[in-house]
Structure formats: C-alpha cells, structure tokens
Amino acid sequence: MTPEAARELLLFHSGTHPCVDDVRWEQGFLGMLRPYRGLREENFHSVMACLRALADDLQGDTIDRAVVSALWGICHLARAWGISPEGMLRSNDLISGDDVSRLQDWVEQISSTTFFILDGDVDEAFDSYGPPQPEA
C-alpha cells in the first residue's frame, strides 16, 4: 500500500474523508460502530496496514495533521462510543462484553503502535502485532 492510499483509507476509517457517499466511509473502523453492526476484524488489520505504510512519513520532522487526527479520532471515538460504560453502545446494551474486550484490544494496539512510530521505533511498534494468516 502506498502512503497516499494509506492516508485516504485512514480518513475513511475515521469518518473524516469528504466523500461521505463512498461505501468505505460507512464500512470503516468508526463506521462499523455507528450504527453498530458488529465488529469487523478486517477494519482493525486495515488500520494497522495503513500505519505500516505511513511509518516513514510519521517519523519526519513535519507530519500530516489529517493523518494524526484520523488516528487520534479512531482511538478516542472508539473508546467513547464502544468501550466506555457511558458510551452509546454499552449504555444501550448494543455491544457484547466480548466485543468490548476485542475493541479495547484493537484500540490499545493502534494507540501503542502509533506511539512507537511517532517515537521513532518502528520495529517495536509492530512487535506485538500479528497480522492475519491465510487459511490453509
């Protein structure tokens, strides 16, 4: 994935891309939470692939504010909507406890990976991430 494609995809995942009629906007990471239709693991792996593609750009002296905002938004809003007991999904009993735990794991992984990339340690950033393996 090119950095340009990763940037565009992250904007869809965060719901900040201006093309709101594109299916990627509705089916992205935050789109799957509002309205809640269940967790889609491929969205998590897609965000992680975007981070890998953008790792060099995120270590520069100047970084793209839209990319950082998208990553921050994904983590912040997923916590507010789906992980927090007062969030719309938990307070309305729309998300199971198992899905809350899984969403929390994903958000922590995205947040941690972003931190290590911004801190300049790409190897450490992806150390605990295991991408999906093809089925035999």
Describe the function of each predicted region.
Residues 50-51, 110:
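Short low-polarity hydrophobic stretches
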